[in-house]
Amino acid sequence: MSSIALGVNIDHIATLRNARNTEYPDLVEIANIAVNNGADFITVHLREDRRHIRDSDVFRLKDNLNVPLNLEIAAIDEMLAIAIAVQPECVCLVPEKRQELTTEGGLDVKNMFTYLMPFVTQLHNHNIKVTLFVEPDINQINYAKKLSVDNIELHTGVYCNHNTQNELNRILEAAKHCYTNKIECHAGHGLDYQSAATIARVPYISALNIGHFLICEAVLHGIGTSIYKMKKVITNPL
């Protein structure tokens, strides 16, 4: 199988920084440590409430990274304008609720189709690739295909929480459907070493996005060591 890419989400480095409103830990420094230890791209989620990542973080990361920046945003005009100004390599459109602790599920592309269309078009007009974060659902992927998005990121949270064969089968079928429809397939949410190794074995998934678990592991083992181990786990799954 071809090597799978690792996207490291550093949102919770910003959470730690913001706890005391300090300038440290520095996100650019952490991002570059991640890259030096196997991260193929860096992911950040600029939320409407700015609970972790700030606007200035996104611009600094874009200006100081030698790997692609993957910017997660809600599909709203404010975030679209920021994305166009930043010019990340890719924007991942995600659902967002102010009271949620983290993203709770995928976009309902079917019901949001007309609403999402101008966002996808404008991002493409500025040469920014577009990913949609969706549940492993064939119907949702069909509507994403109609929007001509570049990538799908499958929500792995349900699988990670329940570890059922039925949910893994949904991911397998969704990844194959992406391949059949010529959409690059990524996956993420809730992944740890064990679940990431399983998802990395799924044919047609080309990248994983992992954040919270790696930051927690970094408290015990250091950010570089944790990312190096994860990259080894997903590129050589048992």
Curated annotation (Swiss-Prot):
Which parts of the sequence are marked as the site Transition state stabilizer?
E153
A Pfam family found in this protein is PdxJ
Q: Where in the cell is it found?
A: Cytoplasm
Q: What EC number is given for this enzyme?
A: 2.6.99.2
Positions with a binding annotation for 1-deoxy-D-xylulose 5-phosphate: D11, H12, R47, H52, T102
- The molecule here is called Pyridoxine 5'-phosphate synthase
Annotated binding of 3-amino-2-oxopropyl phosphate, by residue: N9, R20, G190, G211, H212
EC class: transferase
What processes does the entry annotate via GO biological process terms?
pyridoxine biosynthetic process
Complexes and interactors: Homooctamer; tetramer of dimers.
**Which family does this protein fall into?**
Belongs to the PNP synthase family.
**Record keywords: Cytoplasm included?**
yes
A molecular-function term among this protein's GO annotations = pyridoxine 5'-phosphate synthase activity
Q: What does this protein do?
A: Catalyzes the complicated ring closure reaction between the two acyclic compounds 1-deoxy-D-xylulose-5-phosphate (DXP) and 3-amino-2-oxopropyl phosphate (1-amino-acetone-3-phosphate or AAP) to form pyridoxine 5'-phosphate (PNP) and inorganic phosphate.
Which residues are catalytic? H45 (proton acceptor), E72 (proton acceptor), H189 (proton donor)
The protein's matches in InterPro entries, at most eight in alphabetical order, are given as: Aldolase_TIM, PyrdxlP_synth_PdxJ, Pyridoxine-5'_phos_synth
Keyword presence, Transferase: yes
